[in-house]
Amino acid sequence: MITALLQCNPVTGDIRGNVEKISQAVRDAVARSPQVNLCVTPELALSGVNPGDYLSMNDFVEGCRKGLDTLAERFKDGPELLVGAPVESVYNASLLSNAAVHVHGGGWDVVSRKIRPKSSRDPEARFFDRGVSCGILTVEGWRLGVVLCESDTEAEFWTVQGTDHNPLLDLIARGVDGLVYMTAVPYTMGSRAETEAVLTHVAARHHVHLLSVNAVGGNDGLVYSGQSLALDPTGAVYARGRAFEEDVLVVDMAEGSAPVADVSGCWEEGVLGALTLGTRDFVHKCGVSRAVLALSGGMDSALVLAIAVDALGADNVTAVLMPSPYSSRGSVDDSVELADNLGVKYVVVPIEPMMQAFAGAMKPCLDLFETYEGDFTFENIQARIRGTLISSLANRARALVLNTGNKSEGAVGYSTLYGDAVGALGVIADLTKTQVYQVAEWYNKAKGRTVIPRAIFEKAPSAELRPGQKDSDTIPPYDELDPIIEAVISAESRVPAGNLGPRAEEVRTRIFRAEFKRRQEPQPLFVSQRPFGRAWSVPLAGRFRLPE
């Protein structure tokens, strides 16, 4: 039996466009193998992943139904399709089902409805029913169990949390030749290797063929890596979809032979692939083609510029250098060298005249209050001047601003709202400063040349908002700060702050106090297991204070 795994990159909400994308993938599969019997999409391929409150709109749900009708008519003579789509629930009239829809013979019917635990982590859980069981589809004499299920943990794969119900064991007991796992699992560092190990175990333990079809593409802050899989009953992977690209994987379960794609060799490569795809899709799915960013001469903006060029092309990226009287000559020179290496157009706009104009214009209101030790007013004005300039350029260029802040800065609030915190997308907002340097080193190695100048690696990190300033004047050195941040926000650890070093309590307090900034900063691209903005929340107006 020949099956095509359609590793699609849908645009959420664009049902018309997604119908065409699925249709083209089916045609590509048929062109490669005219005998293809079944084509399978990822979960929610018709609507797009994470549709949110689109699901509350009747015309959107009706549009999904019409999309299925179109596919049924278009492929009434074959091949058969399994399409991930939202459909009306048969259990609760006020809800929908996240379903696997069998399209065949000019019509369609629901095979499986996604099973989820009561305490689902899925933000769309309020729109969907919990499902009951996974269905079996028979194609060319093969009995295929069709699985959509939110797993509790990888160790309890496909076990519904809080119950003894295991959809996988239910299917095995009913007798199947293979499993088709339709999914949309967001990328996080290291997660894909873990998932592949679990799938290998499942196929080998139950001696069944296993086809896993995963979504690919960026959707707001989430990135889906693709890397769909075909495994034989021994657990051997005999076909693997490309990472971070659309792909059509045609496999013959009877023979179990197909080319196997290369596997990512290191976490830095995976992160770079995710951030590049996430940036490209965020910009393009917002209906824009260009991006602008502030280039400071530091590592954060250097890496974001490199990612932007890979994602959008050098012709669609503009860098702005905005030196102040406190900027070093090296910062400007290093920025120019980087822009030239990447072939990016840039402009240099000194901000000293604007700093002087702001200081004069603001004097009457600032004089109402006395200054104080640690008064950052004029340092923040520099950042806000830069934020105004880069935002204005984005207006004129019809572009999006790419923010260059990292997770370490975001954790402790080392940024200026409406200044260096402006932007549409936080490209590296889920990478610590340590990780930023590691990914940048890998980037240069992968390119086979020194694109990011060595001087940027070697200089001490600094916002250059006052003479001789270094980041470590205000916050702990990053090699000390980053482990504390990871420990504080880790879901697994409840490590007493005192066990994390002498500055741990200070860092934890800053993390809590900076929540109001993080809530106003650009959408991050999520790549870690525990990102701010998705898996973390503390009160804005709280005060974390323990009894003595």
Residue map of PLM features:
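Enzyme catalytic cores with a strong preference for nitrogen-chemistry domains
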Residues: M1-A294, L305-A314, L321, Y346, ...
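ATP/NTP-dependent adenylation/nucleotidyl-transfer catalytic domains that generate, transfer
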Residues: G13, H207, P233, P259-S296, ...
